[in-house]
Structures are given as structure tokens and as C-alpha cells.
């Protein structure tokens, strides 16, 4: 009985070993199949991972089989030993049954693992088939797209060829013409936009500026006396003319030599004219001659004494004029050494406008402008009052402008840098940078451009008008040019065939810039370009 049990056990073990051998053969075939497949996608990678896990399970199964074989061999050895040691058949039978139960469980576990391995392999094969099918579909779709692109390129070439034939130009020529057309449209649009922006900004700025200037001017009303180059000295009688002339003209020669003026005695009754371009010397001569006429004693010595007394009075008048101007301008803290220089401006004129009164008016205008726009009132008032300080020394200093001389005098007598810079920049000899600089320029322009404030000779006026018209007619396309309102307005007629509407705007801007650079015109100059086209036809008999 024991021998039969052992034989059955041996047969069972042999069957298990054979089954394991078959499973190993199947595993080797699966591995060879796996190595031949091309993994080209994410699903294949995942399938490989599942296959790897299945292979690991197979390896674990092999280890378990080996372990079971070892246990079986050990059990057989123990069974043999126990059979030899057993004294009865029951003990051997129970041992064999236990061994068979162990073997049965091992076989069931191996069978279950083999089933899982087969299932994993089946899923892997299905995934590979799907990937291959997708690859084939993608290749077919790519081929179709390539064919479609080729067809589109062919049709595009046919269309371009037909368009070139119909248009009578090549593709490059059409592109160049389109670029040129777009460029013209862009320029026209840019000019229209720029003109609209400039017009709107100018209108807004002019409205605001007119409001501010009107508010400022209505609070500043100044009397303005324009001196001439001739002073009149009344005489008590015509006999006094002979005494003024003296024996053989001795008195008049001495008077002209001492005073530096020209004495004009004509047929006009009871007056003598004193002519001189220097108002101070003319005023000294007038007072000296008035004293001589009142005294009645006219000879070279009395002429010299009267001249000295007049010079002393003029110096006192300069100090009084400076103090009065400071009071009217609202300035009280200034270096006393500047008073004689400021007072001498009482006898200086610019285009007939008295410079000292002009400085006072500028100071008041600048203070009001500063108050309107929120600038420093006192700095603007001071800079505007001193802006023409250099005119007191300009005739005696060559090679320097009155703005540069005035700035140097202001620096010498302790004025602030802001005031100095405003004085130097009020005629754009240096660039204006601060609000004070622009306010001083504006006040100077308002005072000078006010109607009746300044005048010039007819010859200079006509020459300036001719120059302005010549500048305008020098531009191509200009037919006629008319300077109006003392050069403050230009009306220009252009050839409508040579200048279109957009070029007319650009031409007006160019002419305005040229006039501003080449001619000095008080105030602003407005340039109007007129482009008129007329078509006239006649019908009927004369």
C-alpha cells in the first residue's frame, strides 16, 4: 500500500513538472513574439509594462514551482523515511494524503497564474493591432493631405498666371503698385489726421490763450508815449534865433559840439528843432537850450554850464524814473546800482516805444499771466521787468545782443538764475526751458504787438513786405502772394494743376516756417493758401 502511494505521488510530481515545462515553453514563445513587435505609441508602452508584470509573475511562478518541487522532494524523502519508520499503514496514508493536498493546491495556483498571463498577452496583442491600424490610417490621411496641397498649389499657380494675363502685369509689379497705393492712402490719412489734430489742438489752445490774455490785458492798461528823433524848443521870439546862432555861427557850433545833437533852424516861427537819434542826448540838449533861452545869455561858456546842469538833472531824472517804474511794476527789492541803468531806459525807444514803460507793462502782464496759470508771480514779474535791461548799454557794446548783456548785468547784480535765464532766452538766443521763460516771451510779445505800441519807417515796412512775398513766391506752384496787415497775414494763390488739396496744407506749413526763420514780424503770421479751379465754356454767337 505504501509503495502504491509513493508511485502515485511520483506520477503527480511528474505531471506537475510536465505542466511547468509546457508553461515555460509558452513563456519563451511569448517573449520572442514581444521582441519582434515595434512599439510606436503610448498604448504599446503600457502593454509592455503589463507584459513585464506578467513575465515577473511567470518568473515568480517558476520560483514557486521550483520551491514546490523542492518541497515535494523533501516530502518524498520524509515520506520514505516516515514509511520506513512507520509501524503501520495508516500513518503512511495520512502523510501521502497531506502531500497530495499540498500538490493539488500548488497546481491550482499555477493554473490561475497561467490564466492571468494568457489574458494579459491577449490584451497586449489587441493593443498592438489597434496601434498598427491607427498608424495605417494616419499614413493614408497624410498621403491624402499631401495630394490636396499639391492640387491647391497647382490651382494657385493657374490663378496667379490667369490674373497676371488679365491684369497685364507680373505678381511683383502688382505687389509694388499695391504698396505704392497703400502708401499714398496712408500719407493722405496721416495728413488728414494730423491736420485734424493740429486744428483741434490749435483751436482749443487759442481759445484758452485768448481767454487768459483777455483777462490779463483788461487788468493792465498802460499809457504809451512814443518819442521821435526830433525835439522842439519854443522861442519867445524870432530874434532869439539869431542869438542861438551867434556871431558867425559860433554859438550853434559850440552847442552842437558840446551836446552832440543837430540844431535845425528853419522858417518855422518861434521854434528850434533838435535832431538826434540818442534820446538822452537830445533831452540834455533840449533842457540846456531851454535854460539858455530863458536866461538870455548865450555864449560858449554859458552853453557848457547849461549842458552840465542839464546832465545833472537828467541823472536825477533817471533815478526818479527808475524808482517810479519799480513802484508801478510792484518791485521793491533791487540793487541800487541798477537804478541809473534802469532809469536810462526812459530815454531809449524800440520802434518808437519807450523801453522803460515797455518793461513796466511787461512786468504787469507777466504777473497776471503767472497768476492765471499758477506760476511764480514774483519771479515772472521780476524777469519781465528786467528783460530789456541790456538795451541801456547796447549802443556802446559791439558784438553782443541786448539779451546777453542784460543777463550778464543781472548776474553781476545778484539776480537769481531763473531770472537770468529768462532774460537771456526772451529772444530765443538760448532755448527757453522754464515756465518763466515762456511767460516773459509772451508778455514781451503782447506789449510789443499791441496796436500803436511800436512803429517803423515806411521804407523798412515796405522792404519787409516785399521780402515776405518773395519768400512765398519762391516755392513751386505759387502763382501770387499778398502780404496783408503789416505781414501778419499772407494770402497765397497756387496753380491747381501743380498743387492738390493735401499739398496745399503742407505748402502753407512750409511757407509759415520759412517766414518765421527769415523775417521778424511782430506778433503771429497767418498763412492762407488758396487753390481755385474754374472751368468755363461758351456757347452761342458773339
Swiss-Prot record:
SUPFAM superfamilies: Eukaryotic type KH-domain (KH-domain type I) (SSF54791), HD-domain/PDEase-like (SSF109604). Residues 229-289 form the KH domain. Its EC number is 3.1.-.-. GO terms for molecular function: RNA binding; RNA endonuclease activity. It comes from the Bacteria. CDD domains: HDc, KH-I_RNaseY. It is a single-pass membrane protein. Residues 52-92 are annotated as: Disordered. Its main location: membrane. The chain crosses the membrane at residues 1-21. Residues 355-449 form the HD domain. Residues 59-92 have a biased composition (Basic and acidic residues). This is Ribonuclease Y. It comes from Cutibacterium acnes (strain DSM 16379 / KPA171202).
